[in-house]
């Protein structure tokens, strides 16, 4: 082809060869003489070849595409064929099936037709009769089993005689299938797991009979009611009664006959009715027999022959049996005849089973209860419990059906077991109310009485549980009171006191609660068994019950709290159980409810989580014994109740009348606070140590007897504030810590100081004097731990924190950190606690008023501290404090004050400050507590403090002002409670008493009045100022503290300083006086009196604490500042806190005024004083509370003994410098990790702290005496409390290890400190 093609192509050779494609042959020929033309031809050839190839490829591609399309089309057709076959197959299958059936039916029909054609009409009727009768019987059975017959004229039985024909008309109400059919058990419940049929096994056999019985029961009830109404209406007319009874029977008969006849023929019905009417005068048996024998004879026969018809007859018989029985009541012989009559019995056949069970009365009761009976079975088990308790519990639990379970699982362990057994016995009954249908009737008979109770206890099976609870007193108080009080939780004020009485009675019962631990553990296990019920109970008992418990448990716990703090029990008494009672009544509603919501979940958890709760309680109790008791009891309720009993015994011994309850309430709150503190300690291991120290400290605080009386008002306020702060403050754990610390500080002045630091809300005096205790608690933990602790507590008591910081330079860093926390907590404590307390009860209002004042006073103290902002400026907290300086409101420099004191230990404390800055980080705890406090701070603090201050100060000013000598502790405590309601109160109550009595008596009354008035205004301002706090936690706390201090200065003798310069100027004057060592000593003394003075009245205290804390705190800071200001200029702060522009003399006079005006400030300064009490305990000489005396003496000396105090205070300051270092070292011990030296000092100072505290108190007399005094006084004051104190120490140990393994060393030190603190404060108090 190639050749041919080129050959063929050659002819057109005329065409240029290079313009046409060459053939292969041509190319070969010209290969030897290749030319450009050959190239062109080759190119053309190649191009043509390429085009051909491409075209061929396209063609092939098209062909392939066509093939693919064909294949797809073929595939589609194939599928269509498949579908067609499938459709055909299905269609044929269906058609075949239908066709077969049709064919068969047709064949049958044809055969039947043929047969029928053969039969006559009569034969057809005869054949149909059985079928019709069977259908009628089935219908009647359905009506009987599935419907309840309602008689329209049931109420008009008399008029029914005339309208007998109309009775044929029936109203059918479908039955509730689940009345007879119990629901399955709760998934996961014990019965559910144990029984294979999960509660549904019996139904298959019983369902039909039960259903029919059920229907007959309902019908019989209706008939009974009708008959009864007929009988009563026409009781005299036997014919009427018979007629009416017949009517009702006729009604049933007509119903059966009607339906049977409706299916059959109306003629039969008419005949039956006519025959029945004619026979109505006769007995029911005759009538029924006649009617049944009449047209229905076939039906009756078939009913007898057929089981189903027979059943219908039985149902009818039973139906009539109630009517007959009723009629029998009217006519006994007919009843026998009716029952004997098989036809009549067949009419009542529904109740044939019930005949034995029910006479009409029983049956009617049963049926009335039948609806109840379903729940009644639950009551059957519950019946034993007193209905009143169930009544209370029902509202409290408010858990509808499951309430009983909740109570069963939660409220009783053993009771719950019993109830579970009962539930198992009555499986249907176990479902909230649904009992087994048979059980229902049996239960109805048994529970007819129970049903009455049942409805009350039905929801609260705990009623039984309650009964068992007395045995399981834990639950009785815990859940019974919880739910009872929950119902009464709102009126918690009354409820709390009532619950206190209950708690006492329960505590008497609770003493057996040693048994209760097992029950509690059982309850825990049972709760575990029923996680759902457990959760529900926890939800209700923790939340609702938490409130109820907070009311009831707190009320009952107050005694337990007293037991918690053996020292605190007495201290509660000391601080005034009246105030405690007020708190109890008011606190339980608000603070208890709130505190216990946070607390009680743990309390409830104590049963569920015994170790945590117990740990918290043991720490909160500050008594290892009590903690162990509670653990053994397995529930804090038992422990709280036992402790409450012990505490009540002690309290009654100490405070006997009002103070016993108050002490109980206070300490119940203290418990809560401790509990929360425990939580906080869980959050912060250092806090755990602090909590231990706090708890150990409380025993120390308790010893001062004189302080107790004065403190008693304060303690209630303290605790009300504590609980209120606990409740109101978003940071309940922190508040609780503060409260715990406060509760423990109450034990003794040394404890007060230690507790103050533990509280962390008492940064200045608390950290200074309480620094050792805080250090004890946080000594093994790092200074951060102490600071975190302080912060946690500080959140409760921001002002106290500031004070503490000012008081001890070591604490200053903590104070800085605590500032934010305390500031946050302070507002919360004041606003939340005060407002809620005020809202909840007058007592709380009164107590809270002092508390509010305490908070305000504490704030003022802090404000005074902020005056020494420059002092804090030196510290790392300088930022916080510098902010305080920059912000007038930030006179929060009270924290700087604390920093001044801390600054006084600048070498270590500057580190401590930095470490406290680390504590700021550690303030994770703070932030956790602080953040809630912050949020509450502005709104709750300003609004609540304003409301509370306005209300409470008025209430407390008169009562607390008179208390100044004895109430100063309360006032001081109240002052500190503003930031740390409970702990500050307690601590300061101890130190303030002496000072308030000595230095603040004459000054307290006048100064308090002015200060309180000013404090109210100033506090409001302070709140406003505190809110704008620039820094997160510290600056807010510092600002608020400084603002509060400014306000306080404006309010009271501190007002002499000027409110605006009080912080800056006040601090400057304080610094100036402090610069002079003598002046510093006197100022320190003055600060102590201020604190002591404010302690005088809770209201005055808080106000004075505000006004006085400036001077008092500043003075106090400068007292310790005298020691420190030399090193850091803390003195200038104290001078400033004494009075903005006051000279040492002016400061002393102002301080005395403040001590008078600021018993709260003394208390607030009490933190400083607490630290001073650790250092200038000379004040302690004068009063049972050396710290208070120190403050008081300091104030008095500042005025009268200014030089003495300068020398003594200076010496105290020197020892305080050491002591403060020691105290602060203890605080630093909390901060210790950052400062090993401080920690060592803390170790040495732990004993020294007690010694220093003793010395401080001794400085009032003699510093060395202070130590012995504290030890001796604490012991003598609280012999019972000494045990509690030691147990508190033990608890502190237990809680410390629990909280932190890292705190082991610090725990040991803290324990030693705690014991020392207890010994010293006890001795000091006892000596005084």
From Swiss-Prot:
Where do Acidic residues bias regions lie? Answer: 219-231, 248-273, 441-453, 797-808
Q: Where is this motif: LFa 15?
A: 1249-1257
UniProt short sequence motif LFa 2, positions renumbered to this chain: 440-455
Motif annotated as LFa 3, chain positions: 474-483
- Sites bearing Phosphoserine, chain numbering: 157, 159, 204-205, 209, 283, 384, 387, 531, 536, 610-611, 720, 744, 749, 780, 795, 867, 870, 1042, 1060, 1077, 1102, 1162, 1165, 1327
Which Pfam families does its entry note?
CAP-ZIP_m
Extent of motif LFa 17: 1317-1325
Motif LFa 9: chain residues: 849-855
- Motif LFa 16, per the record, lies over 1277-1286
Protein name per its UniProtKB record = WASH complex subunit 2
């Amino acid at each position: 082809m190639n050749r041919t093609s080129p050959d063929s192509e050659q002819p057109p050779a005329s065409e240029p060869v290079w313009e046409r494609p060459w053939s292969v042959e041509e190319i070969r020929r010209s290969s030897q003489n290749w030319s450009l033309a050959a190239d062109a031809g080759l190119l053309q050839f190649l191009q043509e070849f390429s085009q051909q190839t491409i075209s061929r490829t396209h063609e092939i591609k098209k062909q392939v595409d066509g093939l693919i399309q064909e294949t797809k089309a073929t595939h589609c057709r194939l599928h269509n064929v498949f579908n067609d076959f499938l459709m055909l197959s299905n269609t044929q299958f269906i058609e075949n099936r239908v066709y077969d059936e049709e064919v068969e039916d047709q064949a049958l029909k044809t055969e039947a037709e043929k047969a029928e054609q053969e039969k006559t009409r009569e034969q057809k009727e005869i054949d149909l009769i059985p079928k019709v009768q069977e259908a009628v019987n089935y219908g009647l059975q359905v009506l009987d089993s599935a419907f309840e017959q309602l008689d329209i004229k049931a109420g008009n039985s008399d008029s029914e005689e005339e309208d007998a024909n109309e009775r044929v008309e029936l109203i059918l109400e479908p039955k509730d299938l689940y009345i007879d059919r119990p629901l399955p058990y709760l998934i996961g419940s014990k019965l559910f797991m144990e029984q294979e049929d999960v509660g549904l096994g019996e139904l298959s056999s019983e369902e039909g009979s039960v259903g029919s019985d059920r229907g007959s029961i309902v019908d019989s009830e209706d008939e009974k009611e009708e008959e009864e109404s007929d009988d009563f209406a026409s009781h005299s007319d036997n014919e009427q009664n018979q007629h009416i009874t017949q009517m009702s029977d006729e009604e049933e008969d007509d119903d059966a006959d009607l339906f049977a006849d409706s299916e059959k023929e109306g003629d039969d019905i008419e005949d039956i009715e006519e025959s029945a009417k004619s026979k109505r005068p006769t007995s029911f048996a005759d009538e029924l027999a006649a009617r049944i024998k009449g047209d229905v004879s076939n039906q009756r026969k078939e009913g007898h022959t057929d089981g189903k018809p027979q059943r219908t007859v039985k149902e009818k018989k039973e139906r009539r049996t109630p009517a007959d029985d009723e009629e029998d009541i009217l006519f006994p012989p007919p009843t026998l005849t009716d029952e004997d009559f098989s036809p009549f019995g067949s009419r009542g056949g529904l109740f044939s089973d019930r005949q034995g069970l029910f006479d009409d009365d029983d049956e009617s009761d049963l049926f009335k209860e039948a609806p109840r009976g379903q729940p009644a079975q639950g009551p059957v088990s519950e019946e034993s419990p007193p209905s009143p308790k169930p009544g209370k519990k029902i509202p409290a639990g408010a858990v509808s059906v499951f309430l009983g379970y909740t109570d069963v699982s939660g409220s009783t362990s053993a009771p719950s077991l019993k109830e579970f057994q009962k539930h198992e016995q009555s499986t249907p009954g176990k479902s909230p109310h649904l009992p087994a249908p048979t059980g229902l009737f049996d239960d109805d008979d048994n529970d007819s009485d129970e049903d009455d109770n049942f409805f009350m206890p039905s929801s609260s099976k705990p009623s039984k549980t309650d009964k068992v609870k007395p045995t399981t007193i834990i639950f009785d108080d815990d859940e019974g009171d919880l739910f009872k009080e929950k119902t009464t939780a709102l009126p918690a004020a009354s409820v709390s006191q009532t619950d206190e009485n209950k708690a006492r009675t329960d505590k008497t019962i609770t003493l057996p609660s040693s048994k209760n631990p097992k029950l509690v553990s059982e309850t825990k296990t049972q709760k575990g068994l029923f996680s759902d019920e457990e959760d529900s109970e926890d939800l209700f008992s923790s939340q609702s019950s938490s409130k109820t418990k907070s009311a009831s448990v707190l009320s009952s716990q107050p005694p337990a709290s007293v037991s918690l703090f053996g020292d605190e029990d007495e201290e509660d008494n000391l601080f005034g159980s009246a105030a405690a009672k007020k708190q109890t009544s008011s606190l339980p509603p608000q603070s208890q409810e709130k505190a216990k919501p946070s607390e009680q979940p743990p309390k409830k958890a104590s049963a569920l989580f015994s170790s945590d709760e117990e740990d918290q309680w043991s720490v909160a109790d500050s008594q290892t014994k009590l903690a162990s008791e509670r653990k053994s009891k397995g529930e804090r309720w038992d422990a709280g109740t036992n402790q409450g009993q012990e505490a009540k015994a002690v309290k009654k011994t100490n405070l006997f009348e009002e103070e016993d309850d108050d002490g109980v309430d206070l300490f119940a709150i203290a418990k809560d606070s401790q509990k929360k503190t425990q939580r906080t300690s869980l959050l912060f291991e250092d806090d755990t140590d602090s909590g231990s120290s706090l708890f150990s400290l409380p025993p120390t605080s308790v010893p001062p007897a004189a302080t107790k009386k004065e403190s008693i008002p304060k303690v209630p306020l303290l605790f009300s504030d504590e609980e209120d702060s606990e409740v109101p403050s978003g940071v309940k754990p922190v508040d609780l810590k503060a409260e715990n610390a406060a509760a423990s500080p109450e034990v003794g002045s040394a404890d007060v100081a230690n507790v103050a630091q533990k509280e962390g809300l008492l940064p200045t005096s608390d950290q200074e004097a309480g620094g050792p205790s805080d250090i004890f608690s946080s000594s093994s933990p790092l200074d951060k731990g102490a600071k975190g602790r302080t912060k946690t507590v500080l959140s409760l008591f921001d002002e106290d924190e500031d004070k503490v910081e000012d008081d001890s330079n070591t604490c200053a860093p903590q104070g800085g950190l605590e500032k934010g926390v305390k500031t946050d907590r302070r507002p919360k404590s004041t606003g939340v606690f005060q407002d809620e307390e005020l809202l909840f009860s007058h007592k709380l209002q009164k107590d809270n008023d002092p508390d509010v004042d305490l908070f305000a006073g504490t704030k003022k103290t802090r404000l005074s501290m902020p005056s020494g902002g420059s002092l804090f400026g030196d510290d790392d907290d300088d930022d916080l404090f510098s902010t305080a300086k920059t912000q007038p409101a930030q006179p929060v420099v009270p924290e700087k004050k604390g920093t001044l004191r801390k600054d006084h230990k600048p070498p270590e404390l500057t580190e401590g400050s930095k470490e406290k800055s680390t504590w700021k980080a550690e303030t994770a705890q703070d932030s956790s507590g602080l953040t809630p406090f912050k949020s509450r701070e502005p709104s709750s603090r300003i609004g609540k403090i304003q409301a509370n201050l306005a209300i409470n100060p008025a209430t407390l000013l008169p009562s607390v002002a008179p208390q100044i000598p004895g109430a100063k502790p309360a006032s001081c405590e109240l002052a500190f409670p503003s930031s740390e309601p409970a702990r500050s109160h307690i601590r300061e109550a101890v130190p303030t008493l002496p000072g308030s009595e000595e230095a603040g008596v004459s000054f307290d009354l006048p100064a308090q009045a002015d200060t309180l008035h000013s404090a109210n205004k100033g506090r409001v301002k302070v709140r406003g100022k505190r809110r704008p706090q620039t820094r997160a936690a510290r600056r807010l706390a510092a600002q608020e503290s400084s603002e509060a201090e400014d306000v306080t200065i404006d309010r009271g003798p501190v007002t002499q300083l000027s409110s605006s310069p009080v912080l800056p100027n006040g601090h400057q004057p304080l610094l100036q006086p402090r610069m002079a060592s003598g002046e510093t000593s006197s100022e320190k003394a003055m600060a102590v009196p201020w604190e002591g003075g404010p302690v005088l009245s809770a209201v005055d205290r808080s106000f004075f604490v505000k006004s006085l804390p400036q001077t008092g705190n500043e003075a106090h800071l400068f007292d310790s500042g005298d020691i420190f200001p030399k090193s850091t200029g803390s003195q200038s702060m104290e001078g400033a806190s004494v009075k903005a522009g006051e000279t040492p003399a002016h400061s002393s006079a102002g301080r005395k005024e403040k001590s008078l005006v600021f018993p709260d400030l003394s208390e607030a300064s009490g933190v400083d004083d607490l630290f001073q009490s650790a250092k200038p305990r000379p004040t302690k000489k004068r009063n049972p509370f050396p710290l208070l005396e120190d403050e008081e003496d300091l104030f008095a000396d500042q005025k009268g003994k200014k030089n003495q105090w300068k020398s003594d205070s200076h010496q105290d300051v020197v020892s305080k410098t050491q002591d403060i270092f020691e105290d602060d070292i203890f605080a630093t011990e909390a901060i210790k990790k950052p400062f090993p030296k401080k920690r060592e000092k803390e170790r040495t100072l732990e004993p020294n702290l007690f010694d220093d505290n003793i010395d401080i108190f001794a400085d009032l007399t003699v510093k060395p005496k202070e130590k012995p005094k504290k030890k001796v006084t604490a012991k003598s004051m609280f012999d019972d409390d000494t045990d509690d104190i030691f147990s508190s120490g033990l608890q502190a140990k237990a809680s410390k290890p629990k909280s932190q393994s890292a705190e082991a060393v610090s725990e040991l030190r803290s324990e030693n400190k705690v014991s020392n603190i207890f010994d010293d404060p006890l001795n000091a108090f006892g000596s005084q």
